[in-house]
């Protein structure tokens, strides 16, 4: 995520910045009170329940009309589409929901956790400890993310401090916000020393030989939250039975995934029928 994307996302989470989009969302809802389920997602495993439920027609089994999920490449694009009503259900980083709710008064509701843990700190092959990140740059998916919290805890536990300076000192680590889909390429180009993010990008880096997993976030903070599924508050308030049916499908998707992990991985990949991700 470049500075322009960051500023755009920050603006979306202020009252003034989000007002036109919220008005557009209200108009959409007035015109389509029974709108179909429109899912927006990033190509990361955090979207699993949404995509599994779509692929296995679990929404239809609950009587919910659903359109094909729409892939977005950045959090800014995803959040803008949600606030404006282009999509009416997305997964977002859990701390981001607090920022959205109290920063812009965005009328959203958290329906469920998408998963626990499931992320990792991946570094260049020559780095063997957290302490070796001193003087280097590490990418995070967003400031308001569990990834940022876990990483800063790890760094401080190893005597390092965080900075945004372009020239970090030997006991400092520069953190930058970057879209997950850009992280592997940045690591391969040695523009960053590491990144902390959800799968599949940690596995992609290892498979390409450009990085290795140094720590799993679940080993630092057991069963931590990561992404959550959110809906528009007006859907929850005005058609609660519809939201319940959607939630039922998502729960069934979670349960199926727990018992069919290999099948779920194939389903989510570019080899799957839905081709939900480019991986």
List PLM regions with ranges.
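N-terminal export signals
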Residues: 5-25
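Solvent-exposed alpha-helix faces
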Residues: 11, 87, 192, 248-255
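Short, glycine-/small- and polar/acidic-enriched structural segments
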Residues: 31-177, 189, 193-203, 210-223
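Soluble non-cytosolic domains of exported or imported proteins
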Residues: 44, 73, 145, 181, ...
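Short glycine- and hydrophobic/aromatic-rich loop-to-beta-strand nucleating segment
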Residues: 120-122, 228-231, 235-236
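Short beta-strands and strand-coil junctions in structured, solvent-facing domains, enriched
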Residues: 129, 236-237
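Secondary-structure end/capping motifs
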Residues: 237-279
């Amino acid at each position: 995520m470049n500075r322009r994307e960051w500023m755009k996302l920050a603006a979306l989470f202020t009252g003034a910045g989000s007002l036109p989009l919220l008005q557009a969302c209200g108009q959409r809802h007035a015109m389509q009170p029974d709108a179909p389920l429109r899912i927006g997602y990033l190509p990361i495993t955090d979207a699993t329940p949404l995509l599994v439920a779509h692929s296995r027609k679990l929404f239809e089994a609950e009587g919910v009309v659903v359109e094909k999920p729409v892939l977005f490449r950045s959090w800014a694009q995803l959040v803008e589409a949600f606030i404006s009503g282009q999509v009416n259900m997305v997964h977002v980083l859990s701390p981001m929901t607090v920022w959205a709710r109290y920063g812009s008064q965005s009328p959203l509701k958290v329906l469920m956790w998408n998963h626990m843990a499931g992320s990792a700190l991946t570094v260049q092959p020559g780095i063997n400890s957290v302490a070796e990140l001193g003087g280097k740059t590490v990418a995070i998916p967003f400031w308001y993310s569990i990834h940022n919290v876990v990483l800063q805890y790890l760094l401080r536990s190893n005597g390092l401090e965080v900075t945004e300076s372009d020239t970090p000192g030997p006991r400092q680590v520069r953190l930058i916000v970057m879209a997950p889909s850009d992280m592997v390429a940045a690591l391969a180009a040695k523009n960053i020393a590491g990144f902390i993010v959800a799968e599949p990008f940690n596995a992609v880096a290892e498979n390409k030989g450009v990085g290795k997993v140094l720590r799993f976030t679940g080993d630092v903070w057991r069963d931590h939250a990561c992404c959550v599924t959110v809906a528009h508050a007006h859907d929850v308030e005005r058609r609660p039975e519809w939201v319940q049916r959607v939630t039922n499908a998502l729960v069934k998707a979670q349960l199926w995934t727990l018992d069919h992990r290999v099948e779920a991985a194939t389903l989510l990949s570019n080899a799957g029928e839905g081709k939900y991700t480019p991986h």
